[in-house]
């Protein structure tokens, strides 16, 4: 009888430690953020630096979009920011986006545009993998 109680208590303790460890991991573990860019109807070559980052919850992260206008003339484009998956948009806050909104991109060579953001912990219902995407479209009809 004593041995059964010991094994039962040990099993409950191991399960409790595993559950506490899993919850702590979900709240403290870094969130993988893929940095993506898409040029839709504009003659841009875009490089993201870095392509992916492991962001600790609450840490301010800076990434760079290196944009080169491949046209001979300056191009005015609109940069739209989307965060995926859509149900976890509130998990990321973008504080600065130099390439968001309407900008004129010169044809003199690649230019660096910074984006600063912060992520919240995945928690129990969040995502451990997010995507920060900038889509560039013409701001005026061509």
Region roles according to the model:
Residues 1-45:
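Membrane engagement elements in two modes
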Residues 28-32, 40-48, 78-84, 99-102:
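Generic detector of short, locally flexible boundary/turn motifs and exposed helical patches
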Residues 31, 59-61, 73-77, 109-113, ...:
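Residues at beta-strand starts and edge strands
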Residues 35-63, 104:
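Beta-sheet-dominated interaction scaffolds and their linkers
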Residues 51-85:
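Mid-length scaffold segments of soluble, non-membrane domains
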Residues 53-54, 59, 70, 96-122:
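Intrinsically disordered, low-complexity Pro/Gly/Ser/Thr-rich segments with frequent PxxP/GP/PP motifs
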Residues 64-67, 115-117, 132-134:
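Buried hydrophobic-core signal for structured, non-transmembrane domains
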Residues 73-96, 103, 119-142:
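Terminal connector regions
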């Amino acid at each position: 009888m004593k041995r059964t109680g010991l094994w039962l208590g040990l099993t409950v303790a191991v399960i409790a430690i595993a559950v506490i460890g899993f919850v702590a991991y979900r709240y403290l573990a870094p969130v993988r953020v893929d940095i993506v860019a898409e040029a839709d109807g504009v003659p841009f070559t875009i490089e993201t630096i870095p392509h992916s980052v492991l962001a600790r919850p609450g840490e301010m992260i800076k990434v760079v979009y290196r944009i080169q206008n491949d046209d001979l003339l300056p191009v005015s484009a609109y940069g739209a920011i989307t965060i995926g998956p859509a149900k976890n948009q509130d998990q990321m806050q973008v504080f600065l986006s130099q390439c968001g909104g309407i900008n004129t991109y010169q044809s003199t060579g690649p230019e660096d545009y910074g984006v600063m953001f912060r992520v919240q912990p995945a928690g129990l219902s969040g995502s451990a993998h997010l995507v920060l995407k900038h889509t560039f479209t013409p701001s005026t009809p061509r």
